[in-house]
Amino acid sequence: MEDFVRQCFNPMIVELAEKAMKEYGEDPKIETNKFAAICTHLEVCFMYSDFHFIDERGESIIVESGDPNALLKHRFEIIEGRDRTMAWTVVNSICNTTGVEKPKFLPDLYDYKENRFIEIGVTRREVHIYYLEKANKIKSEKTHIHIFSFTGEEMATKSDYTLDEESRARIKTRLFTIRQEMASRGLWDSFRQSERGEETIEERFEITGTMRRLADQSLPPNFSSLENFRAYVDGFEPNGCIEGKLSQMSKEVNARIEPFLKTTPRPLRLPDGPPCSQRSKFLLMDALKLSIEDPSHEGEGIPLYDAIKCMKTFFGWKEPNIVKPHEKGINPNYLLAWKQVLAELQDIENEEKIPKTKNMKKTGQLKWALGENMAPEKVDFEDCKDVSDLRQYDSDEPESRSLASWIQSEFNKACELTDSSWIELDEIGEDVAPIEHIASMRRNYFTAEVSHCRATEYIMKGVYINTALLNASCAAMDDFQLIPMISKCRTKEGRRKTNLYGFIIKGRSHLRNDTDVVNFVSMEFSLTDPRLEPHKWEKYCVLEIGDMLLRTAVGQVSRPMFLYVRTNGTSKIKMKWGMEMRRCLLQSLQQIESMIEAESSVKEKDMTKEFFENKSETWPIGESPKGVEEGSIGKVCRTLLAKSVFNSLYASPQLEGFSAESRKLLLIVQALRDNLEPGTFDLGGLYEAIEECLINDPWVLLNASWFNSFLTHALK
């Protein structure tokens, strides 16, 4: 195509087109269709104006041969093909001398006879579609639009075609010739299909009224008006020495660009303080399930029926007692709450027909645990705006916490395989379109690697709990509904299994806004003795509620069974995201896909099969104090999934801030590793921004400690 363009068009046109493309950072050698389109458009603009003059009487005449009379004036001013600054200068001077309204976009021509700007369009599509796009883009009554197509059709504003029949025929013939020449070289199809719609970037966006006043108020120092600030910005050359640029911007800024060397960065400072505690909405590695295989009982699938059936599989219940109190709570209330659940479940069984849902009696212990009547009364602002000392509550700074080892163990556990499958293949959605075989193949390989992963169990558990809680919050706003925490899976042998982790009791839930909070009490089974890591369980009251017989290599052993109880809260928006946790599968699949793509582009063929089936190859997984950890491709899939799942389970403002700010430092370090000689200013400020997010969140603290390991190894 490039050769064709150079042969087919006048060298002056080719040169102008190259210049125009370079001005927008485009390469004529690469974007050859665009190159051809620009040349065609330029040629049509020149042909439009050729031979058209205005005589001394102001009439328009056509002079095709010889030296025209010196008194003749060109009918059209050509704006297209000039560089932007020059083009705007011409437009401004025309507007000043003729009083014509200034266009928002650079037009192509000015017609001195009709006193109007003209926008010329050349399209490979339907003329009326292109006409509408142009009209929509320029939104000006005053600019005349004239569209030509390669098929000989044309369309103009109000069907006013400006030129005589013959001049237009000349343009149409030329376009038809270009099309035939392209077709004979096999270039036409690609050229025809490459046309994109009009980009609607406003050149001159007029600001008026309040916005104009705000714009004038918010100008940087030393600028008197929006116009001269705009002129300054337009004239700002983006390359060159940064220090000079900054001092040119403002006298107050003196940023010294410091070279960023291997010795420059220091590790992030992690906070001191008591060890951080568990803050997830449900237990992760410490959860215990009561399960039924191949459920076929009456009402199977109704959560309450399933829960009762699961409870009946356990025979080691005993009189509950508190083994780890909650520091601040009224612990006997937690104990009473569990006893109430047991009693009310027993009541259900004594009924003729088990109900589908169970609302708990509003006892003292539940009212306390669910914060009933605890919220301060809401008062309308109108009624209290005259109160002289009206102010917001003083809130305490959050207490700093140090990194504890349990969160790394939680993460390691999330990456492990369980002996059950937690997603069916269609969980990620069937192919709708006959989309490449490759996509399905990747999905199937990926699913095989993660379907048994514990992080996938957490996804399904999270989806279930959040869905059930949101449903109950809307359907039974005033009730203390008992919600079983359930998940479903398949065993190695393919048998269905229903699991009960414990129960949630929901408080009052009149959720008007996305952020309105619903309180709930969670009660979860576990075999973990809380006294081993009491700091992890700071927010929980833990009861011992039974003894469980476990099969081990040496035979049966009896272990105490615990119940982890705490009050917690969530909101509509958090539940909505919790319900969509399956997205984590998609996110990690996309990350794996980009690894496959990188590999495939090097080898110039699809490497999906090799990628998943070459068991000998190891891949980098992450950094630890020991160095770069490596593992199989399956391990990489599961690690990426676990990270995505933990980002969802431990979502917080601290995580948002840390991710955004630490990424900047990460990019600088990567630039250093790639020998790009990065420079920085105010590195201290960046460290401050990162470290102000390191307060007490276990997942953020763990990520910060991983970041430090990365720094150490990256800069060796």
From Swiss-Prot:
GO terms for molecular function: endonuclease activity; metal ion binding; RNA binding. It holds the Pfam family Flu_PA. A motif (Nuclear localization signal 2 (NLS2)) lies at residues 184-247. Its EC number is 3.1.-.-. It is found in: Host cytoplasm; Host nucleus. Phosphorylated on serines and threonines by host kinases, including human casein kinase II. Influenza RNA polymerase is composed of three subunits: PB1, PB2 and PA. Interacts (via C-terminus) with PB1 (via N-terminus). This is Polymerase acidic protein.
